[in-house]
């Protein structure tokens, strides 16, 4: 009987471990029921990391072929163009992704912080609270894809 309970315990442990791994690897395209559902920030961060310049990043982000951007924040039935605005200050670049709602108003979509510390570069993206909810933060993993922390 001892070995039977040992195997049951082992089976329970492995099933719990597999369940938690499955939860940890949830699809990064999970819908939040917010306007930001039409722009996958994990995909945006991957495009950012692959782009040699901010201009090429903006072009890739808005290319019809990329299928990343499907935002329509001004409800005109057209996909909004996302502007990339860089605000450098010392060793930190604050890169703001914005959409023009009309001629006078813009809506920030997300902010990418890039900080250089010696030979290391830290990148963090924060989705706008109105579009993604509170504390929607992404940081690139050591691999080539981004990890995200949602609400």
Could you tell me what each predicted segment is?
Residues 1-27:
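Bacterial Sec-dependent N-terminal signal peptides
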Residues 25-151:
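N-terminal low-complexity segments enriched in Gly/Pro/Tyr/Ser
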């Amino acid at each position: 009987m001892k070995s039977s309970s040992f195997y049951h315990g082992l089976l329970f442990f492995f099933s719990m471990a597999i369940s938690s791994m499955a939860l940890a690897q949830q699809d990064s395209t999970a819908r939040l029921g917010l306007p930001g559902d039409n722009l996958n920030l994990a995909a945006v961060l991957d495009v950012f990391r692959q782009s040699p310049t901010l201009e090429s990043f903006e072009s890739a982000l808005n290319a019809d072929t990329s299928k990343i951007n499907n935002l329509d924040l001004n409800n005109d039935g057209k996909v909004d163009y996302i502007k990339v605005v860089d605000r450098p200050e010392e060793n930190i670049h604050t890169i703001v992704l914005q959409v023009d709602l009309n001629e006078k108003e813009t809506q920030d979509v997300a902010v990418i912080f890039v900080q250089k510390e010696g030979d290391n570069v830290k990148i963090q993206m924060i989705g706008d609270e109105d579009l993604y909810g509170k504390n929607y933060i992404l940081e690139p993993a050591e691999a080539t894809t981004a990890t995200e922390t949602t609400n």
